[in-house]
């Protein structure tokens, strides 16, 4: 009876005196599990959607968190079984309590290191997104090869950081930009850590640009939406200033204050690049383009070849009247690759002279407006 009474007293002393630490360990372990799940969810999202690679420090932390959670849960089970055992001594409780305090500090310390601004990095496959465009098709690159090659060369030299592509709508600016973007990704980024595509258009929305950039660089913090524009810019600058990036801005109508958005200016040290498309030479000046590339309309011979490729040479030559009208239709495209490809493909199913004459009439009375990439 005395022995049982002593064990009961021992348990009462432990439960009464040390229960706070048990509660703290339970709480800290649950909080660590929640944080671990949040980090893993972020990592998996970027790995699955953008084929990025988790940072080594994040992987190490996840392993440490898993081990700490497992050991803490085992310790809590042991404590529960020990407190219900009649054979437990005051000495064994003291030993367990020392281990409990040590484990509590470990769990809290690991939890304190679980806040990551960035959880992923370039895996060598691509941190950007392939833009939708069948850029390997010959019918789309006729007349654009030289410009695409020139932009690509600018991407490989250190003395040109900002490149502006300008020309009238439909001349193929977005198509060239798409080609370079996809080529970078196909070449495993060619030394760039981030490849970022932003569609700008009219009425510049700096916040939208910041949100697009932060998604591409792997920054996903719950507090992002509550940050001010300046705070967002600071986070973007903090990350991009340490990495080499290629930023593609499509359809720029007016100056975009990239410094205000948090984008570090490209220079010979960071070797980053900013490439944008615009209809205006003036915008090129305002954006500080070090290299300006004007895209011209195609000369007639190349325009006619591009049109025939898309309409189908057999159809174009199938009837003398079709050939004559086809040349007039192609001329209405005014040397614009986008118009030549789009209308050419639309005419590929027209096999009678009358269908071609009808199309020519429509083009003559209601000329379409072409802009965007050649798809």
Swiss-Prot record:
Organism: Arabidopsis thaliana
Listed InterPro entries: Apaf_helical, NB-ARC, P-loop_NTPase, Plant_NBS-LRR
Coiled-coil region: 17-49
Single annotated GO MF: ATP binding
Function: Potential disease resistance protein.
Leader peptide range in chain numbering: none
PANTHER family on file: NB-ARC DOMAIN-CONTAINING PROTEIN, NB-ARC DOMAIN-CONTAINING PROTEIN-RELATED
Lineage: superkingdom: Eukaryota
Protein name (database record): Putative disease resistance protein At3g15700
Positions of ATP binding: 167-174
Any one GO BP annotation for this protein: defense response
């Amino acid at each position: 009876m005395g022995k049982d009474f002593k064990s009961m007293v021992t348990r009462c002393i432990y439960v009464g005196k040390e229960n706070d630490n048990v509660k703290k360990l339970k709480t800290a372990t649950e909080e660590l599990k929640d944080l671990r799940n949040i980090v893993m969810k972020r990592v998996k999202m970027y790995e699955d959607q953008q084929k990025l690679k988790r940072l080594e420090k994040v992987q190490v932390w996840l392993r440490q968190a898993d081990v700490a959670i497992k050991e803490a849960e085992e310790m809590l089970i042991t404590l529960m079984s020990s407190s219900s055992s009649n054979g437990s001594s005051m000495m064994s409780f003291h030993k367990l309590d020392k281990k409990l305090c040590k484990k509590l500090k470990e769990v809290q310390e690991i939890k304190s290191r679980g806040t990551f601004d960035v959880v992923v990095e370039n895996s060598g496959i691509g941190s950007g997104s392939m833009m939708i465009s069948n850029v390997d098709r010959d019918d789309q690159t006729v007349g654009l090869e030289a410009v695409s090659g020139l932009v690509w060369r600018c991407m490989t030299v250190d003395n040109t950081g900002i490149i502006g592509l300008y020309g009238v709508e439909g001349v193929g600016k977005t198509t060239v930009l798409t080609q370079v973007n996809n080529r970078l990704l196909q070449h495993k980024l060619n030394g760039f850590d981030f490849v970022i595509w932003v569609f700008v258009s009219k009425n510049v929305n700096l916040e939208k640009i910041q949100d697009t950039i932060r998604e591409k660089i792997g920054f996903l913090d719950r507090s992002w939406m509550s940050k001010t524009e300046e705070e967002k810019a600071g986070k973007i600058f903090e990350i991009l200033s340490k990495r080499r990036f290629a930023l593609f801005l499509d359809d720029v109508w007016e100056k975009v204050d990239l410094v205000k958005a948090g984008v570090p200016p490209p220079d010979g040290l960071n070797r980053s690049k900013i490439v944008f498309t615009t209809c205006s030479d003036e915008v090129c000046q305002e954006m500080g383009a070090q290299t300006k590339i004007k895209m011209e309309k195609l000369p007639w011979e190349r325009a006619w070849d591009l049109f025939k490729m898309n309409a189908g040479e057999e159809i174009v030559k199938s009837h003398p009247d079709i050939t004559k009208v086809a040349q007039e239709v192609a001329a209405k495209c005014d040397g614009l690759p986008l118009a030549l490809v789009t209308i050419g493909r639309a005419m590929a199913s027209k096999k009678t002279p009358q269908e071609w004459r009808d199309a020519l009439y429509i083009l003559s009375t209601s000329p379409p407006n072409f802009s965007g990439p050649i798809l």
